[in-house]
């Protein structure tokens, strides 16, 4: 590769968006530049970067990122920056967000070939995928106890430190329009990180991290309303019996998702048995197998605290990202971790520490602050279903601007939407827990509408 040419390009890019940058920034970007991913298509016309950003020197915590810029023909310098986070907690944004949902490539069944996605979101924005917290994916800590003591608070703080340091490495993105997007348990991560950025931007007229808003999908939001909505969805869709429904309502409403009572765990186990061999993340989709997703579905804790959707494509990602040539191309696993790369960390998820009962106070604060907030939901997800999301949104008591209406894609209903003062709610018909995986075109329309601050199309 002609690194002198890359150096010139990077210098020109940085100089157009900020004053002269020290050469160390350019050197760091050159170090992180992905020249070519094994198996990628030949017609890739966008820049990619990946590597590590240290968030705690003393304990040796470093988070792995993957930046996928917009195609050169779409002028990436004019496009916003979007941080994507997956949930779990303990699941990888590389495994799900990048490889299965919104990234430019999907991994082929041979675990070797990358295929281009027609509705990749980097056509609309520069995408930054972060594996967080330490212990997830390629992100690591040199202090083993960190993997057993992490929780919401540390995850938010480390993610914020990551952003501060990352923007120093990529100063051309400073002051750029910036959004945070995620799904599932990122329903905690996204608003919590947004709150931190908003608070620490106070006093700056032109903050480097120019946060404009956030969007979450099938998001864990409020324990009480998530319980009500989830159990109601199970019962309304014929997934559980009347007696188990009443048992769940009696045993589970008054406890937290982190510390369920024995009675609640019994009720959840009964619900799991009654649901049988279905894919709870997409109830009308044939499950890939009867092992991984189902064994982790309830697992003695609440369903929305488990891992993300487990289609067969995850198997291909596990093969691909554990290849040494792939890790070398991504500048990943530089410390030679003692465990293989996995889509979700059992340790991080099982030993999760703090998890507040509700994100609604953060919503109220950031709505008042004027941030753009969108919430979307695939309507065939039984893990964090649309009913749970609607109960949580209703609890905010927001004034309605545009009442519930069907939105359209080429004359067909793509879902439904309601616009509130300070928040937009969108459903995607036929989509499961991972909306962009099941309905990529409709998810693309949703993302475009969000970025453009336009309501979902009515015709």
UniProtKB/Swiss-Prot annotation:
Top-level EC class: hydrolase
Matching Gene3D superfamilies, A to Z?
3.40.50.11320, 6.10.250.940, alpha/beta hydrolase (3.40.50.1820)
**Its principal location?**
secreted
Question: So which residues are the signal peptide here?
Answer: 1-20
User: Where are the glycosylation sites?
Assistant: 142, 289, 333
Residue numbers annotated as active site: 184, 381, 433
| Keyword Glycoprotein among record annotations | yes
**Which GO cellular component terms, listed alphabetically, does the Swiss-Prot or TrEMBL entry include?**
extracellular region
Q: In which tissues is it expressed?
A: Ubiquitous.
Q: Does the keyword DNA-binding apply?
A: no
Q: Where in the cell is it found?
A: Secreted
Keywords, in A-Z order? Carboxypeptidase, Disulfide bond, Glycoprotein, Hydrolase, Protease, Secreted, Signal
EC code(s) of this entry: 3.4.16.-
Highest taxon above the source species:
Eukaryota
Q: Which GO terms describe its biological process?
A: proteolysis
Q: Name one GO molecular function term.
A: serine-type carboxypeptidase activity
Q: What are the cysteine partners in each disulfide bond?
A: 91-344, 252-264, 288-312
Role this protein plays: Probable carboxypeptidase.
Q: Which family does it belong to?
A: Belongs to the peptidase S10 family.
| Name of protein | Serine carboxypeptidase-like 27
| Species for this entry | Arabidopsis thaliana
Q: What is the lineage of its organism?
A: Eukaryota, Viridiplantae, Streptophyta, Embryophyta, Tracheophyta
């Amino acid at each position: 590769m002609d690194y002198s040419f890359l150096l010139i390009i990077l210098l020109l890019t940085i100089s157009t968006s900020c004053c002269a940058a020290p050469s160390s920034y350019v050197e760091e970007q050159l170090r992180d530049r992905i020249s070519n991913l094994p198996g990628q298509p030949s017609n890739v016309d966008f820049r990619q970067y990946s590597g590590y950003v240290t968030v705690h020197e003393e304990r040796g915590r470093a988070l792995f990122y993957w930046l996928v810029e917009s195609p050169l023909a779409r002028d990436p310098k004019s496009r916003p920056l979007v941080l994507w986070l997956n949930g779990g907690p303990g699941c990888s944004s590389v495994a799900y967000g990048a490889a299965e949902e919104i990234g430019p490539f999907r991994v082929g069944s041979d675990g070797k070939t990358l295929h281009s996605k027609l509705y990749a979101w980097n056509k609309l924005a520069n995408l930054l995928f972060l594996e967080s917290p330490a212990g997830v994916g390629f992100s690591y800590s040199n202090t083993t106890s960190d993997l057993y003591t992490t929780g919401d608070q540390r995850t938010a703080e480390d993610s914020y430190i990551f952003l501060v340091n990352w923007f120093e490495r990529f100063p051309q993105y400073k002051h750029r329009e910036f959004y945070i997007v995620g799904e599932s348990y990122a329903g905690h991560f996204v608003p919590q990180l947004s709150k931190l950025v908003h608070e620490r931007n106070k006093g700056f007229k032109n903050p480097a991290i120019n946060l404009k808003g956030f969007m979450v999908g099938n998001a864990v939001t409020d324990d009480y309303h998530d319980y009500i909505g989830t159990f109601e969805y199970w019962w309304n869709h014929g997934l559980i019996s009347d007696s188990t429904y009443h048992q769940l309502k009696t045993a589970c409403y008054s406890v937290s998702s982190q510390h369920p009572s024995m009675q609640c765990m019994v009720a959840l186990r009964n619900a799991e048995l009654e649901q049988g061999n279905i894919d709870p993340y997409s109830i009308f989709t044939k499950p890939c197998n009867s092992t991984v997703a189902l064994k982790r579905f309830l697992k003695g804790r609440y369903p929305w605290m488990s891992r993300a959707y487990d289609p067969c494509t995850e198997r291909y990602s596990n093969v691909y990202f554990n290849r040494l040539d792939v890790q070398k191309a991504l500048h990943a696993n530089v410390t030679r971790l003692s465990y293989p790369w996995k889509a979700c960390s059992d340790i991080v998820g099982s030993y999760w520490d703090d998890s507040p009962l509700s994100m609604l106070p953060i919503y109220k604060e950031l709505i008042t602050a004027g941030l753009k907030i969108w919430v979307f939901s695939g309507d065939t997800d039984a893990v964090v279903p649309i009913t749970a999301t609607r109960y949580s949104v209703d609890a905010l008591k927001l004034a309605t601007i545009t009442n519930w209406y069907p939105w359209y894609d080429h004359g067909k209903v793509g879902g439904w939407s309601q616009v509130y003062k300070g928040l937009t709610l969108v459903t995607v018909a036929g989509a499961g827990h991972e909306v962009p995986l099941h309905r990529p075109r409709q998810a693309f329309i949703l993302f475009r509408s969000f970025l453009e601050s336009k309501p979902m199309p009515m015709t």
